[in-house]
Amino acid sequence: MVIAGPNLTIDRTLTIDELRLGEVLRFDGVAVTPGGKGVNVARVARALRAPAVLVGFAPGRTGAAATALIADEGLELRAVPVGGELRSAAVVLERSGRVTVMNEPGPPIAAEDWERYEAAVAESLQGHAVLVCSGSVPPGAPHDAYGRLVALAARSRAAAIVDAR
């Protein structure tokens, strides 16, 4: 399985009694993990012992940190270099169980960045029967980004699943 999750993130999960806007808050705990819908799909594939490669943009120092965290989880990542820094997300988990997620948009990409991404997905599809496209795409990605990846899958005779807005 190839997982197209172009807009990776670093998630900072912050635990607190209650989120109160307009106040200075002290968190009870902080966990830093790689995130994004594609990473979640890769985790499920690993749990099911399904061979999978995640293809994502991994810009800057934060991209290098995410790449290391992804490897620490035993997930295979094909990182596509791009300028800027990887986006982050703040996940606030309250004692009540309520969750608030604040996502950054991700670094803007150019047309040639997306072309390199498509090439990485196409190359990764060799020997795989399924392409999963999951999560958001970075600013600057073509409006038909996932449609183009589905067409790549069709040319490779791979099934395609899209889970994105």
Task: Indicate residue ranges for each PLM-predicted region.
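Short, well-ordered, mixed-charge alpha-helical segments that flank or form enzyme active sites
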Residues: D11, I109-E112, P139-H143
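Short, solvent-exposed amphipathic alpha-helical segments in soluble enzyme
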Residues: E18-L21, L69-E73, G147-V150
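Glycine-rich phosphate-binding "P-loop"
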Residues: R26-F27, A31, P105-G106, C133-G135
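General beta-strand structural signal in soluble alpha/beta enzymes
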Residues: I3-A4, G56, R78-A79, V132-C133, ...
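Conserved beta-alpha-beta core of the PfkB/ribokinase-like small-molecule kinase fold
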Residues: A129-R165
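Glycine-rich phosphate/adenosyl-contacting loop at the front of the ribokinase-like
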Residues: M1-V55, A64-A65
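Conserved N-terminal subdomain of the carbohydrate kinase-like
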Residues: E23, R46-V130
